[in-house]
């Protein structure tokens, strides 16, 4: 098998494990990491969650909104901020890159998609928390954007690596 086909098989296996719109893991150094479609902004989570509850609770509450609450919670999950043409608090379905930098949840690393990039990008929030932008396979205005790279975390070394399929 080629390196490219191995990368795609790995991506497919990871996709099969993810259930819901977000999940979390803890790095080997104890840092908690939130993984979601578009990212968590403090203005959106403020009414739903307190950092004292822990990241597990935010993930649980957000996924329950999608998987259990159904249409009752779809309005909350669908809110878009000004960056995406809306007027509400940016939800984890619609948060934009600039909104995350300005108001990403404090104290947590975030790994997100949704904001198209040419390659995986590491950034920081105004609170100096790490943001990884990983949407590298988008289709915009009849052209593709991105190099299909993705992010891998190694808990033995506590390091992230950007993998490219070719």
Give the predicted meaning of each segment.
Residues 35-36, 110-115, 133-136:
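Active-site neighborhood of phospho(di)ester-bond hydrolases with catalytic His/Asp-centered motifs
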Residues 31-33, 108, 129:
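Conserved catalytic motifs of the protein kinase core domain
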Residues 41-43, 101-102, 111-123, 139-142:
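Active-site environment of divalent metal-dependent phosphoester hydrolases
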Residues 1-103:
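Active-site-proximal loop/helix segment associated with metal-binding centers of metalloenzymes
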Residues 122-166:
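Binuclear metal-dependent phosphoesterase catalytic core
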Residues 15, 63-64, 71-73, 118, ...:
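Detector for Asparagine
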């Amino acid at each position: 098998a080629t390196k490219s086909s191995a990368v795609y098989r790995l991506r497919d296996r990871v996709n099969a494990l993810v259930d819901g719109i977000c999940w979390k893991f803890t790095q080997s150094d104890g840092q908690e990491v939130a993984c979601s479609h578009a990212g968590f902004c403090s203005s959106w989570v403020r009414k739903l969650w307190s950092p004292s509850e822990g990241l597990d609770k935010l993930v649980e509450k957000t996924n329950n909104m999608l998987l259990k609450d159904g249409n009752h919670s779809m309005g909350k999950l669908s809110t878009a901020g000004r960056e995406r043409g809306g007027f509400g608090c940016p939800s984890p379905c619609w948060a934009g890159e600039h909104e995350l930098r300005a108001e990403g949840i404090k104290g947590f690393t975030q790994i997100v998609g949704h904001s198209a990039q040419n390659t995986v990008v590491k950034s920081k929030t105004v609170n100096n928390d790490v943001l990884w932008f990983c949407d590298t396979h988008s289709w915009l205005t009849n052209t593709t954007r991105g190099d299909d790279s993705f992010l891998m975390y190694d808990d033995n070394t506590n390091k992230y690596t950007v993998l490219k399929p070719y």
